[in-house]
Amino acid sequence: MSTENFDCVSCQLEKQPVFPFNTSESISIVIFDLIYSDVWGPSFVSSIGGSRYFVVFVDDYSCYSWIFNMKHRSELLQVYSNFAKMVEIQFSKPIKNCRSDNALKYTQYAFQAVLHSYGTVHHLTCPGTSQQNGRAERKFRHIFDIIRAPLLSAKVPAPFGGETALHAVHTINRIPSPVIQNQTPYEHLFRSPPDYHYLRSFGSACFVLLHPHEHNKLEPRSRLCCFLGYGET
């Protein structure tokens, strides 16, 4: 007698397997078809600017990432609204779909109202299945892998962790990725290769030119400083 297709309740209760998740890296065909988002925090120490959280947005098609420091989780609503408006104006495209976990910050009425105002469809992951938001989860791991190295090598104090995270994402967006045929996320999004000439190591020494009123003719014309990241340009 064949037992190949025989199952009993006890066997199912004891041996129920977890179905594998889709290994596809991308399901989008154009930029901003799908954005992954997640919030990390609170940090054990506040940054220089008072931030203890940060939120990341990852475009599924280009793998380009945006990161924003926040003092409180409640700032997510305004941060996302500003981000969606930036995408709409700078790229002439709406965010069609947004995927996140089921945390209250994403399911509250005010956040849902903002999504509806932009016509964005919200996809929530099933409880206990962080793999469905895997792009954002892996991005956090990548960010922290890059954050630790400069903090340790440059001996930068922990309160500069927020600035280190911004620097890390700026760098990640300019590193070739096998997910997008070894192009950089920057090139995949902007359709032009990134400029590398201005990149510097986090925590390295730099010299800032002083304004004429900040020194006299016998004093130094620059000040020795520590490089902590790039301005928004």
Regions found by a protein language model. Give the residues of each.
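Anionic group-binding determinants
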Residues: M1-T233
